[in-house]
C-alpha cells in the first residue's frame, strides 16, 4: 500500500523523480515568498543548509494547512560558494556570471526535504554534495550557454548535471539525487518507517 504524497512544489522534475520511484504523488505548489523568508535568515548568519530546511518546511507547512490529513513533502535546494548563496539566474547574463563565479572552485548543493502532516513536522533532512567545477574559459561558457539555452535558467547553478552540464565538472562528491534537488534515498527510508510506502 502506498499513501499519496502531496509534493509542495510545481517542479516537474521532482514530481517525476517521485513517480519514477513508484510513489503516488500529487503536486500542489506552495504559496511562499522564498526570498522574503530567506533574507532575514542570511542576514542573521543562518547556514545555507538550514536556509534550505526552513524554506522546505515553510512550503510543506503552507500546503499542509490547505490539505488536512495529507502527508506533504516540501523541498528546497540552496547553492553556496563560501558564504555566498546563489539563486536561479534571471537571464542568460546571470547564468554567465554564475558559471564564471563557480569556475575552478568547489561549491555546495544543499537539498532539503521535510515531511509535514496537519502542520506538524514529522521529518526533516538535508543532503549535501560538493561540486568542483573545472576552470572554464569565458568563450567556452558562452558556447555552452548557447547550446543549453533556457535550460540554464532552470537550476540554481545554471547547469544540469544530467545533461550537457556534466562537462563543466572536474569532481563531484555526493548522492546523485541530492545533486538534482531531492535527497531521495533518505526520503524513501523515512516513508517506509512512517508506513506510507511498502517495505
Swiss-Prot record:
MF (Gene Ontology): nucleoside triphosphate diphosphatase activity
Site (Important for substrate specificity): 13, 77, 162
TM helices/strands, residue ranges: none
Keywords, alphabetical: Cytoplasm, Hydrolase, Nucleotide metabolism
GO BP terms: nucleotide metabolic process
Catalytic activity: N(7)-methyl-GTP + H2O = N(7)-methyl-GMP + diphosphate + H(+)
Stated name of the protein: 7-methyl-GTP pyrophosphatase
Primary subcellular site in the record, as a coarse category: cytoplasm
